[in-house]
């Protein structure tokens, strides 16, 4: 059975970057690898746990989109893209290509619209499709075969949202009404204005009563008091906000399942990039996991038969998955997972520095300048020991 995953690249990249914001991953070259590491971690988690048969990663284009052209203030409130993210994007694209996963990008349209078009068409064909993103506006696209797949965050696991979950989250009768909700209450993350003075609760009440913005605006005579004034005064703004909030499903892109079919990665190129980024433990996990799993399985099989598996009936990451995504917890791939040194994993500490084989120099950090220097130095270290 086909299972298609469509990933919203920038949503996941930003999420990865800010997941490590208090403890950025800086390699020996001084490069902040947080966004790259977090993105790859999430991608690996999906590939290993959910084993999609087809996959694609959608990016926003470099230039403006039709929404920016229609509304100059669209997303204008957002801060400039952090330099670490800007420098990481080309590397992430190289990694995606090394995984042999198609990059989906259409000039003039956001990743939302590209995913919306492909997911809607896939749903029509009966293909089980997961849109991987934390953005709530994707809820409008959910249907019988199309689901939101929200990435894990902290202790929270991946969340799969179908029709009933979207209806419950927004207190609406249909996922399509997500657009009407956003049109009325606005969306601060995208700087969509909505109707001034109308919040989520009022929007829910109005949509429950009238079903859509169009029907509401044709019955404003039934409204009373201040609410009537707000809606009638801001009629055009409400309609325009719905336009901005609507994810397009007719972008000029074709759903080609052959092109989206999952392939084996280019291991040589992938290893080269990981080594450049100094992702030593990730290299071990990605390239040696199956070998280690097979070896461990042969060694422990008789032990498990005698005493039972440590995890009982819990399936491994490599068991054949069900058609719906796994809800099973796994620290591998978690944006917040800690990465041990590969020698620690193997129980080999012989090459680690210690007091007996290292020169050391005690220093008192008693000025702001010294504090800044020690922090900068510590940020370049992979392993830190605190007494």
Regions found by a protein language model. Give the residues of each.
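Extended hydrophobic/aromatic-rich secondary-structure runs
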Residues: 1-2, 7, 201, 219
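Noncatalytic, basic helical substrate-engagement surface that gates or grips nucleic-acid strands
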Residues: 2-132, 136-164, 237-240, 246-254, ...
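Conserved RNase H-like, two-metal-ion catalytic cores of nucleic-acid enzymes
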Residues: 3-5, 15-54, 72-73, 77-84, ...
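Non-catalytic nucleic-acid-binding/docking modules located in mid-to-C-terminal regions
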Residues: 51-56, 99-101, 124, 143-147, ...
């Amino acid at each position: 059975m086909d299972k298609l995953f469509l990933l919203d690249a920038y949503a996941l990249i930003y999420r990865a970057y800010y997941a490590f914001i208090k403890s950025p991953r800086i390699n020996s070259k001084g490069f902040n690898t947080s966004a790259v590491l977090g993105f790859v971690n999430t991608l690996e988690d999906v590939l290993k746990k959910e084993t999609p048969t087809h996959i694609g990663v959608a990016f926003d284009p470099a230039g403006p989109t039709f929404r920016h052209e229609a509304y100059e203030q669209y997303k204008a409130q957002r801060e400039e893209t952090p330099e670490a993210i800007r420098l990481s994007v080309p590397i992430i694209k190289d990694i995606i290509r090394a995984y042999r996963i198609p990059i989906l990008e259409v000039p003039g349209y956001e990743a939302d619209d590209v995913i919306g078009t492909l997911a809607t068409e896939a749903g029509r064909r009966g293909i089980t499709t997961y849109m991987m993103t934390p953005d709530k506006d994707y809820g409008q696209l959910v249907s019988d075969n199309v689901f939101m797949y929200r990435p894990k965050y902290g202790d929270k696991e991946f969340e799969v949202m179908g029709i009933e979950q979207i209806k419950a989250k927004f207190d609406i009768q249909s996922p399509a009404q997500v657009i009407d909700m956003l049109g009325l209450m606005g969306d601060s993350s995208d700087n969509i204005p909505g109707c001034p003075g109308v919040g989520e609760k009022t929007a829910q009440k109005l949509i429950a009563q009238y079903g859509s913005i169009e029907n509401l605006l044709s019955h404003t005579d039934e409204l009373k008091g201040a609410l009537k004034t707000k809606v009638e005064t801001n009629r055009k703004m409400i309609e325009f906000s719905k336009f901005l909030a609507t994810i397009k499903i007719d972008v000029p892109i074709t759903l080609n399942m052959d092109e989206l079919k999952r392939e084996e990665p280019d291991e040589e190129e992938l290893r080269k990039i990981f080594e450049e980024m100094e992702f030593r433990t990730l290299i071990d996990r990605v390239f040696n996991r199956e070998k280690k799993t097979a070896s461990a399985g042969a060694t422990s099989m008789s032990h498990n038969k005698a005493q039972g598996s440590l995890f009982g009936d819990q399936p491994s990451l490599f068991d054949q998955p069900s058609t719906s995504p796994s809800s099973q917890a796994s620290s591998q791939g978690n944006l917040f997972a800690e990465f041990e040194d590969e020698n620690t994993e193997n129980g080999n500490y012989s090459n680690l520095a210690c007091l007996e084989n290292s020169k050391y120099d005690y220093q008192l950090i008693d000025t702001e300048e010294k504090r800044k220097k020690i922090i900068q130095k510590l940020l370049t270290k992979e392993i830190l020991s605190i007494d």
